[in-house]
């Protein structure tokens, strides 16, 4: 591509080559899965494939956080390739020209590779969900149909379609130049994908967890509050409001600083600059403080609710003590990494750990809720069927 020509934000020229690359990349984990599961029954094979996809999806979410935190989201300013190429190797001249024109800008050799590796991993997950879907539908028609799978094939089908939605969010994250609402939706969409896979893995594993009704209600309440907190965390990150409050427990030396919630939570606006006062959608210091404080205050409520949940799970019986221990450990890690972001000035390792911990909490809560059954009904685990099937 001529580096002097205008750069199209959407360049589908490398799409076919990227598809071939995605198939090649996915062939590596799929080959490993197939070799290990050759003699297994249908349910065990699908369980292993779901676990593999779940593992890579968690990695994708963490690497996506690294892409965002390292300011690499526009390392390749077009989509789906990099300056119309499959990899930064073919776009050396364009990357060099962009970096020379703006040395402190969003494009550099390392950022281009970070962004493209994120896309490669996303494509690999997409192929795996496609294979999951095909395997689930084939299993439904196999000779083992007399022993039906504890999972409707519509679940992996929905998962595959959701990967397509995530791809669209990824595209608009780039083409709309890190539009905060799109960046936040992309982050939340990745976590929805994680939840979908976790629910399917739990259904295939068939290990129901008996819990008192009160504990289950508390778990659902904690999950709802966690969803709100994750959304607020995504909004803090996409608006670069992490450092809006210096110090803890006070914010900039005040218990209740000046805050502009109206501007801070104006969703339909582009990415502004700190201190820009013109226009209702611009991010002012007060609006960033409002975003930060909303996340901080919700964190206090979440720690209390999840701390109570961990205690109730510990007392509910031996089967749920493992969940209680992991929940308490993740909660403590989130508090430490969150405080480190503020006190230490947002170091990359703390910010990345905080994002990974949030994904870990979402995964844990999804598994807990997917496995939990009322105490009197947890003897058997009924198949997880699609409501419309």
Positions of the model-derived regions?
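Transmembrane alpha-helices
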Residues: 1-41
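Interfacial helix-loop-helix junctions of multi-pass membrane proteins
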Residues: 2-7, 63-76, 161-187, 236-250, ...
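Extracytosolic (periplasmic/ER-lumenal) interhelical loops and adjacent juxtamembrane/interface segments
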Residues: 2-4, 69-116, 242-288
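Membrane-interface loop-to-helix entry segments
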Residues: 13-21, 113-131, 180-193, 289-308, ...
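Interfacial segments of alpha-helical transmembrane regions
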Residues: 42-59, 152-159, 209-232, 320-329
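Membrane-interfacial alpha-helical segments at the cytosolic side of multi-pass membrane proteins
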Residues: 123-140, 192-205, 301-314, 361-372
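Membrane-interface helix-loop-helix junctions at transmembrane boundaries of multi-pass membrane enzymes
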Residues: 136-157, 310-327
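A juxtamembrane structural motif centered on a specific transmembrane helix
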Residues: 196-218, 363-389
């Amino acid at each position: 591509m001529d580096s002097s020509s205008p750069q199209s934000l959407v360049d589908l020229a490398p799409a076919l080559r990227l598809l071939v690359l995605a198939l090649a990349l996915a062939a590596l984990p799929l080959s490993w899965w197939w070799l290990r599961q050759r003699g297994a029954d249908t349910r065990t094979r699908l369980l292993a494939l779901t676990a593999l996809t779940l593992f890579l999806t968690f990695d994708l979410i963490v690497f996506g956080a690294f892409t965002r935190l390292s300011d690499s989201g526009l390392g390749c300013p077009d989509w789906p390739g990099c300056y119309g190429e499959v990899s930064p190797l073919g776009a050396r001249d364009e990357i060099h020209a962009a970096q020379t024109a703006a040395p402190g800008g969003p494009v550099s050799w390392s950022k281009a590779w970070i962004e493209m590796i994120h896309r490669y991993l996303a494509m690999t997950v997409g192929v795996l969900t496609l294979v999951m879907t095909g395997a689930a539908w084939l299993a439904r028609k196999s000779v083992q149909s007399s022993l039906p799978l504890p999972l409707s094939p519509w679940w992996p089908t929905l998962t595959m379609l959701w990967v397509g939605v995530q791809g669209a969010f990824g595209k608009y994250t780039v083409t709309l130049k890190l539009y905060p609402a799109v960046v936040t939706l992309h982050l939340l969409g990745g976590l929805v994908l994680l939840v979908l896979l976790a629910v399917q893995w739990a259904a295939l594993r068939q290990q129901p967890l008996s819990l008192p009704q009160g504990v289950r209600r508390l778990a659902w309440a904690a999950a709802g509050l966690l969803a709100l907190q994750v959304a607020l965390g995504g909004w803090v990150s996409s608006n670069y409001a992490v450092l809006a409050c210096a110090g803890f427990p006070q914010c900039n030396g005040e218990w209740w600083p000046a805050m502009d919630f109206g501007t801070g939570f104006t969703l339909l606006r582009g990415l502004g600059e700190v201190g820009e006062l013109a226009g209702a959608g611009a991010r002012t210091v007060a609006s960033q403080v409002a975003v930060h404080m909303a996340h901080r205050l919700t964190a206090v409520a979440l720690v209390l609710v999840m701390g109570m949940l961990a205690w109730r799970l510990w007392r509910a019986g031996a089967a749920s003590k493992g969940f209680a221990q992991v929940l308490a450990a993740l909660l403590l890690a989130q508090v430490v990494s969150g405080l480190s972001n503020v006190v230490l000035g947002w170091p990359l390792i703390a910010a990345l750990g905080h994002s990974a911990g949030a994904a870990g909490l979402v995964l844990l809560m999804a598994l807990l809720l997917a496995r939990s059954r009322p105490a009197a009904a947890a003897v058997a685990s009924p198949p997880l069927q699609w409501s419309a099937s």
